Design a protein with these regions (language model features):
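Phosphate-/nucleic-acid-contacting segments
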Residues: 78-122
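Alpha-helical bundle regulatory/interaction domains
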Residues: 42-43, 49-58, 62-68, 76-77, ...
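Glycine-rich loops and low-complexity Gly/Arg-rich segments
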Residues: 28-31, 54, 60-63, 102, ...
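Residue-level detector of alpha-helix boundaries and kinks
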Residues: 12, 68-69, 88
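Generic signal for short, ordered secondary-structure residues
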Residues: 6, 22, 40, 62-63, ...
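Cyclic-nucleotide recognition modules
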Residues: 1-59
Length: 122
């Protein structure tokens, strides 16, 4: 699990979409959701001709780069316990809505280790 998207957020396999290549990942909805699909031609047209869409996309990409950077740094510098506690503080709703095995995978730990961490934290 490399990414968890909550309500009113978006996700994609951007490399696959923009470069017209098969994706190296799959995207799975864990709950019913509204799916919006756009083809590359329409996407590029909107990006070039619609200022609001261009700003939306730019802000989205900027936020995603920051999230990815933080996630990578956390994986390298924080212990599994610290990553779990950070998740508790920053995204507590994930613990209610996402099955634990996905959260464990996202945190870079096994489900068993996740259970031990949860038990030790209380």
């Amino acid at each position: 699990t490399t990414y968890l998207a909550l309500r009113n957020s978006s996700t994609s396999s951007l490399n696959s979409f923009l470069n017209k290549i098969p994706s190296r990942k799959s995207i799975k909805a864990l709950v019913d959701c509204k799916l919006w699909v756009i083809d590359l031609e329409t996407f590029n047209h909107l990006l070039k001709n619609n200022k609001a869409f261009h700003e939306f996309y730019y802000n989205l990409i900027e936020k995603q780069i920051i999230l990815i950077d933080d996630y990578r740094i956390d994986l390298l510098t924080l212990t599994p316990e610290e990553r779990y506690q950070k998740l508790l503080l920053t995204e507590p709703i994930l613990l209610q809505e996402v099955p634990l095995h996905y959260l464990a995978s996202f945190l870079g730990i096994s489900s068993r280790h996740m259970s031990r961490i949860r038990k030790s934290i209380g």
